[in-house]
Amino acid sequence: MEQVKPRLLLVVPMLHQGGFERVCVRTARILRNDFEVTIAMFSDADIAYDINGLSVVNLDVPAQDGKLKKMVNVVKRTVKLRKLKKKLRPDLTYSFGPTANLINVLTPVRGQIWTGIRSYMDMDNPSKLKLFAKRSDQVICCSEVIAHELKEKLGIENTEVLYLSLIHISEPTRPEPI
């Protein structure tokens, strides 16, 4: 009898370019043998990463210009992600980037919530960081320096440093042979 794998939901705004988008896809590829991995994205416009063989769900709520439209988008994304979480019942939801982190912490349906702080640009809004930390089980940092600053400057204690080893970083993003 096959053992049931834990369910992992990765949340990202888009997969068009950038560092955390690449980390999201690499994380899915690395963990897919041990977890039932699904990537949820807010828009499938201009996908730049190879997602063949991965379970990907487009929530189809792309970015909008203007404050009112952005606020409406937060509500739409929250509703859609909450529905997806209820359907998939993830054991862990890990989000990449401030936009995805916000929606992740606003949808506490089931399982653990992890939010990712990947750069100093993410640290520009202390009140948002405190919200992420308060509503996250773990705040995942890509460096010891960022984790230290979150603890020292903002009193955020639930941090972990997680990074891909050089072996994983140097691997190509094309799908592995079946």
Enumerate the predicted regions with their spans:
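N-terminal strand-loop element at the rim of the active site
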Residues: 5, 10-18, 22-71
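Short beta-strand scaffold positions
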Residues: 41-42, 94-95, 141-142
